[in-house]
Amino acid sequence: MELSLLNIKGKDTGKKVVLSDDIFAVEPNNHAIYLDVKQYLAHQRQGTHKAKERAEVSFSTKKLKKQKGTGGARAGSRKSPIFVGGGTIFGPRPRTYGFKVNKKVKDLARKSAFSHKLKESNVTVLENFTLNAPKTKDYLAILKDLSLDTKKTLFVIADIDKNIILSSRNLKKAKVVSVDQINTYDLVNADKVVISEGSVSKIEALLN
């Protein structure tokens, strides 16, 4: 699969970039995508929820009333879950929501996401570039030249570039990741995926 290489002005440079069919032209596996996205979102949960049970609420342990003769039900402790303010029965406890997804499945999910985006013509390959300073205005100008300023865009760069990352951080619909930070959720969530020329070989090395 070949794509035209664009410069930061959105113009065709006349060069072609070859993308591996093993990554960008596989039959998308929706279940693999589902599992990887589900795992990613599960790991975002704090899991710090907690409700006090009867052993943890603070009340006197004195028997509320005598055992017999009142005509009412027996009551031994104010901490009982049947009373307002008493302990919670089977309440939430701190837990980890994460679960394991095999590496082969995760790789297949990312390949499927890339292939799906390319099939819909939502992948662009961009010439390598750097910014002299972290300026949101400069990064936004690049997105406008690429007609991507109104779309959710995932920009994949070969290595972490502090100026590019800081320049994009304040833009709600723009996200920049290095190759080793690519995840299925970001790929699926983006309207457009922009790949720097230098990151193509690294993506192939990561997923092959």
UniProtKB/Swiss-Prot annotation:
One of its GO terms (cellular component) is ribosome. It comes from the Bacteria. The keyword Cytoplasm does not apply. Pfam families: Ribosomal_L4. GO terms for molecular function: rRNA binding; structural constituent of ribosome. Keywords: Ribonucleoprotein, Ribosomal protein, RNA-binding, rRNA-binding. InterPro entries: Ribosomal_uL4, Ribosomal_uL4-like, Ribosomal_uL4_dom_sf. The keyword Isomerase does not apply. GO terms for biological process: translation. Residues 51-79 are annotated as: Disordered. One of the primary rRNA binding proteins, this protein initially binds near the 5'-end of the 23S rRNA. It is important during the early stages of 50S assembly. It makes multiple contacts with different domains of the 23S rRNA in the assembled 50S subunit and ribosome. Part of the 50S ribosomal subunit. Belongs to the universal ribosomal protein uL4 family. This is Large ribosomal subunit protein uL4. The lineage of its organism: Bacteria, Pseudomonadati, Bacteroidota, Cytophagia, Cytophagales.
